[in-house]
């Protein structure tokens, strides 16, 4: 069934003009790391996101991940001329996936030159902090300890009763496929430090049960009394709200490059403001007494301050690289129907120029002429968005007349945008992560994931069951014979 479904996807991609790949590293309930590959393209004017497969990762470096993605792409784009179809790539997870120099996106672009790296709405922006976690060992340890708070209280209703008595609210559950919960966890632990200390002390003294609970409560209590942990908690408590604000701003319906640039500037300024407070997070330790002896110099706080400066740099650097390419946002404004009348008076030549530079498969002069006609006619001003305009042109049998406009519309709709796309499709990546609440062997996982996530696609596939039976019957290494003359 899995192979038949993949062959149908291959045929759909063969018939489509453009393709985007979305990849992410995710875990099942057994914490087994999987790399998932999702393919996004248009079918009969409707955008679809098809689950392709899970791939086990023995190594998490950029070259290994790029090889896995390239192996998947080579199956759906086998010919050299097909490589121009890939116009977007979206990655989440480990830092090696998104570096400007030698990251996965750079390696993939060597083989697929038109595959621009863009931020996808399905990827939580809190992965900026995940980048810090994956690169700096001390911060990775901090988040590991932090997640222990929510894990501790999700194991037992009896523990939750102690928490409710002391804190009056439950901690956000730490779910690895939902990084936005980490921000809530940081804020909750920071705001209720004293209450949590009281709770753990209460458990240590009054717990009547397993010793594991007492041991874990003692460990978490030590975290809340540890100067390093509290310093990092203070830092991320200041950073997290700005990440949440930025994520909310990116959900704006009409997201243009000017607005994005303002958001970038404000976010970078906010991070730099937090960066300036780092010396106050770990203030220098003054000698306990003055003496004729030379005082000892404690460099540990200097090292921790250096780490937080490094984390600040990582956050800013990753954010800038993630939104380095934003021409697709500018191109989308060409089809903002509210601006058609204005464009009819003053044509957006600069936006058209950047669009043609980003997508060389477009004929700039022909596209300009077609857009000028659209801007001048009233019937097109009723279209709300690129999808509606594409459907109108197709239903009106104008695909040949507006061939370059159709091509650009397909590119923009195929490209995952930064904001939510409810009118296009529900994120397949989110459905994959929901499915991964289960765990099983790789082959069975791929097959059952395909049947679960793409059940509608399989139901609509012609003669699917018959083709599965025929493939099964023609398998050579079987104990029983199913074909008779």
Segments predicted by a language model, with ranges:
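Alpha-helical structural modules in large enzymes and assemblies
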Residues: 1-485
């Amino acid at each position: 069934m899995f192979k038949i479904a993949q062959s149908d996807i291959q045929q759909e991609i063969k018939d489509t003009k453009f393709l985007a790949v979305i990849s992410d590293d995710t875990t099942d309930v057994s914490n087994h790391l999987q790399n998932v590959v999702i393919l996004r393209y248009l079918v009969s004017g409707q955008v679809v996101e098809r689950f392709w497969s899970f791939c086990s990762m023995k190594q998490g470096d950029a070259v290994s991940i790029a090889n896995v993605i390239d192996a998947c792409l080579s199956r759906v784009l086998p010919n050299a001329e097909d490589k121009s179809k890939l116009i977007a790539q979206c990655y989440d997870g480990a830092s090696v996936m998104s570096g400007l120099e030698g990251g996965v996106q750079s390696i993939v672009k060597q083989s697929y030159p038109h595959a621009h790296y863009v931020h996808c709405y399905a990827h939580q922006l809190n992965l900026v902090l995940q980048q810090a976690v994956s690169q700096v060992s001390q911060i990775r340890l901090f988040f590991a300890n932090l997640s222990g708070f929510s894990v501790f209280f999700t194991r037992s209703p009896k523990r939750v009763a102690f928490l409710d008595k002391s804190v009056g609210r439950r901690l956000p559950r730490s779910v690895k496929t939902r990084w936005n919960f980490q921000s809530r966890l940081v804020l909750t632990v920071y705001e209720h430090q004293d209450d949590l200390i009281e709770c753990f002390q209460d458990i240590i003294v009054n717990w009547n049960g397993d010793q594991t609970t007492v041991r874990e409560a003692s460990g978490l209590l030590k975290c809340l009394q540890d100067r390093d942990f509290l310093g990092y908690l203070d830092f991320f408590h200041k950073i997290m709200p700005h990440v949440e604000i930025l994520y909310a701003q990116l959900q704006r319906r009409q997201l243009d490059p000017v607005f994005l640039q303002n958001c970038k500037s404000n976010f970078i300024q906010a991070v730099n403001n937090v960066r300036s407070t780092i010396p106050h997070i770990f203030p220098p330790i003054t000698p306990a007494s003055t003496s004729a002896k030379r005082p000892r110099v404690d460099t540990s706080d200097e090292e921790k301050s250096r780490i937080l400066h490094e984390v600040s740099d990582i956050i800013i650097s990753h954010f800038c690289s993630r939104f380095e390419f934003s021409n697709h946002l500018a191109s989308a404004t060409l089809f903002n129907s509210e601006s058609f009348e204005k464009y009819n008076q003053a044509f957006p030549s600069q936006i058209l120029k950047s669009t043609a530079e980003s997508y060389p498969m477009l004929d700039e002069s022909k596209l300009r002429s077609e857009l000028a006609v659209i801007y001048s006619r009233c019937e097109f001003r009723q279209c709300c968005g690129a999808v509606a305009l594409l459907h109108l042109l197709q239903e009106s049998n104008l695909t040949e007349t507006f061939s370059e406009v159709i091509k650009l519309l397909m590119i923009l709709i195929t490209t995952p945008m930064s904001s939510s796309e409810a009118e296009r499709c529900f994120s397949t990546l989110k459905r994959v992560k929901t499915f991964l609440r289960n765990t099983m062997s790789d082959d069975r996982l791929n097959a059952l994931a395909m049947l679960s996530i793409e059940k509608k696609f399989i139901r609509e596939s012609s003669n699917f069951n018959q083709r599965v039976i025929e493939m099964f019957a023609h398998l050579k290494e079987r104990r029983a014979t199913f074909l008779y003359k």
